[in-house]
Amino acid sequence: MYKLIIEDDEGKTTVVPLIRDEITIGRKEGNTIRLTERNVSRRHAKLVKSNGSVFIEDLTSYNGIKVNGDRIAGRAPVNEGDRVQIGD
């Protein structure tokens, strides 16, 4: 099973099992994962499981997404151990 480990600005971690094929991340209520930091857009990102792989997609957020320190455009694969940064 895939899982997402969320670490906030203060170093607190939360483990979220990825049981759905599509998960939205953002500041607005109604997202599967809600992050309340100001640098997170209302609808910031989407995680998609497809054919045994996981992808993250930037939903035209203002502050973007980085995978292993590199800013992505559109959609990018996410592998075990990758570090994803939402916002700046």
Positions of the model-derived regions?
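Forkhead-associated
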Residues: 3-5, 12-87
